[in-house]
Amino acid sequence: MAYDHKSIEAKWQKYWDEHETFRAPDKSEKEKYYVMDMFPYPSGQGLHVGHPEGYTATDIMSRYKRAKGFNVLHPMGWDAFGLPAEQYAIKTGNNPAGFTNKNVQVFKNQIKSLGFSIDWSREINTTDPEYYKWSQWIFEKLYEKGLAYEDEIMVNWAPDFPGGGIVVANEEVIDGKTERGGYPVYRKPMKQWVLRITAYADRLLEDLEDLDWPEAIKEQQRHWIGKSIGASVFFNIADSDKQIEVYTTRPDTLFGAQYMVLSPEHELVDEITTLEQKEAIANYKKEVETKSDLERTDLNKDKTGAFTGAYATNPINGEKLPIWIADYVLSSYGTGAIMAVPAHDDRDWEFAKKFNLPIKAVIEGGNVEEAAYTDDGTHINSGFLDGLNKQEAIDKAISWLEEHNAGHQQINYRLRDWIFSRQRYWGEPIPVIHWEDGTQTLVPESELPLRLPEMTQEQLKPSGTGESPLANATDWLNVTRKDGVKGRRETNTMPQWAGSSWYFLRYVDPHNSEALADPEKLKYWMNVDLYVGGAEHAVLHLLYARFWHKFLYDLGVVPTKEPFQKLVNQGMILGENHEKMSKSKGNVVNPDEIVNNYGADTLRVYEMFMGPLTQSKPWSEDGVSGSRRWLDRVWRLLVDEEDKLRDHVTTVNKGDLDKIYHQTVKKVSEDLENMRFNTAISQLMVFVNEAYKSEALPVQYMDGFVQMLAPIAPHLAEELWSKLGHEEDISYVSWPTYDESQLVEDSVEIIFQVNGKVRGKATVARNIDKDAMLDYAKADENVQNFISGKEIRKIIAIPGKFVNIVVG
């Protein structure tokens, strides 16, 4: 008999809602545990099956920690500003707020249908003025500390866009044209707000060491910050009093510099270009205007450039170096100028070959006529550096440069300041007023939040000036000071990153109108103990959140230096064909259908049993139905055809389940603690198999089993808990314990093979049967790597010896 998932799940979701079962008190003698997901952008498509994977993982940890005696904070909110809502509003004439709120409701209903133990009293939405009031407050504090400033920044400008020119994001530019409509895009300087994240570069780098994060994520952050120690070198321009400053990590290769390259936007280009080269330079600059930074720095693209006609002098040997411009050098990195050493840099070598420029080896090894030699070696053709190794030569070159006032040691960062302006309507207004007398002021703190004005469909269209549509809201835009001076509000809005850079703090005190959050509550809850989300946010979101958190720590607003102590990235759920799910491929699975047909608990069990949380794995409809069959089997173990507790659940304990029960409590506890959900479920399956062989099921063991099931399949567990005669719900019942003395027994090591090759092993009870051995084998992480997505053709199991899984 199958259990009725629809009525059971509706019943317990209603119960949890009415009793506010998961509301977390801010004052408790219990130790706190703060667990959260990266909050979703509520798109019009709703949830896909990838979302519940991470959400189920955090929910299991929340439920487990509650049972272990922790005061658990498990909140949810909405990262709800974003371009799609604005595009929808322009197209339909509907307000983006209405579109967004409708999407939020769809997401919320879907999330609630999965039975997550969320404290909904703390729900936040980044588009709520009472929320973005504090985003604006943080901006004002950054401004007051000199960490928010205006600068001329190159943007992607589409002047021919219908309704007037528009600025588009890098990701909206494809081959020099807008993604929507295919209108030409040009690079154009425009005033933008910028946040000085570089002031925190060293701390952002150093404090990574204290975090329990995947090493790969830490490495990506280190790479993005890109700290390097090198030298600034000054090259005098021939027949000019100007100098070009170059930053290089390899001053030891100065003797190999053969030409110089400036970015086409470099301030000296027009000044130093000779009359003969002016037309070529102007044409090249126009050609580059339509290329994004991503296109320009693509390593595989053909090298292009133009000669300025000017020369610079190499300070170390006096050689004249031709000065070129090329798009592979960006004005935003370093000084926007490089010394080219084609013998030992791939891009410089390709450029030199393309334009027939000389190549001179200064490090021994390789054939530089065939390819750049980028390994280490002894210095040659380098005067006083000859015979030295890399580090010795770098140190000596820097000393020489400093002695001759031709350069100095320099620490550089790849990290650039954060461009904080967006030419959009649907974002947080930046609380600045520009006055006609040339001054600017912040909107007074007492007047925050500065709310977005209601706008018509016509007003939401591009302003035509490059400003956001807010420039069309004249009543909102124009202000007059008490002394009669007129002013205009800032028309740029904040990027979507703003709301997600501090939301974890607002969950702590979401309804506070006087402060971002109460200091005592922050002291109790921070920092976040477990943060789960996709690896695609490994760099920017986490870096920006860490930056704002450190700034707020310096202000004394938050009590910790870092926001997230432990970070886990869930793996991607792929389509059945191992491809990424996408609408265009037609392989997207809607979780609503799974919940409707199989139940939320089935989806939860299946997604956690698919494999290790952090690995990508393919979706399988057969796997879903298999998970449902197991839950039906659990139900039948305890409940009869009359919907009553079976007679063989008894207070009598014959002892035949003692060992497997205590083994299961130990294994499941350890696995949940370490987020090994697939092997925890596997152990529960082993226990169920053994329980079916027993004539009497001790009620104490059945209680414990249902408690262990509860974090993973909470609706079914609650129903079984009530069938077992308990009045209270299961959420706060103390986690079962095991007796170490019951674990002492004869054990044996068994081998797991795939196609005859050893892929794993485990220590198990000597009397284990074939089915249980197979369950252990399938749960082994390494075995899963070799059988995932393959057809199992045969299984050979010798009890106490080995399991061999034959796949095709």
Swiss-Prot record:
ATP binds at K583. Pfam families: Anticodon_1 (PF08264), tRNA-synt_1 (PF00133), tRNA-synt_1_2 (PF13603), tRNA-synt_1g (PF09334). GO terms for molecular function: aminoacyl-tRNA deacylase activity; ATP binding; leucine-tRNA ligase activity. Its EC number is 6.1.1.4. The keyword ATP-binding applies. GO terms for biological process: leucyl-tRNA aminoacylation. A motif ('HIGH' region) lies at residues 40-51. The keyword Nucleotide-binding applies. GO terms for cellular component: cytosol. Keywords: Aminoacyl-tRNA synthetase, ATP-binding, Cytoplasm, Ligase, Nucleotide-binding, Protein biosynthesis. InterPro entries: aa-tRNA-synth_I_CS (IPR001412), aa-tRNA-synth_Ia (IPR002300), Leu-tRNA-ligase (IPR002302), Leu_tRNA-synth_edit (IPR025709), M/V/L/I-tRNA-synth_anticd-bd (IPR013155), Methionyl/Leucyl_tRNA_Synth (IPR015413), Rossmann-like_a/b/a_fold (IPR014729), tRNAsynth_Ia_anticodon-bd (IPR009080). It catalyses: tRNA(Leu) + L-leucine + ATP = L-leucyl-tRNA(Leu) + AMP + diphosphate. A motif ('KMSKS' region) lies at residues 580-584. It is found in: Cytoplasm. It comes from the Bacteria. Gene3D superfamilies: 3.10.20.590, HUPs, Isoleucyl-tRNA Synthetase, Domain 1, Valyl/Leucyl/Isoleucyl-tRNA synthetase, editing domain. Belongs to the class-I aminoacyl-tRNA synthetase family. This is Leucine--tRNA ligase.
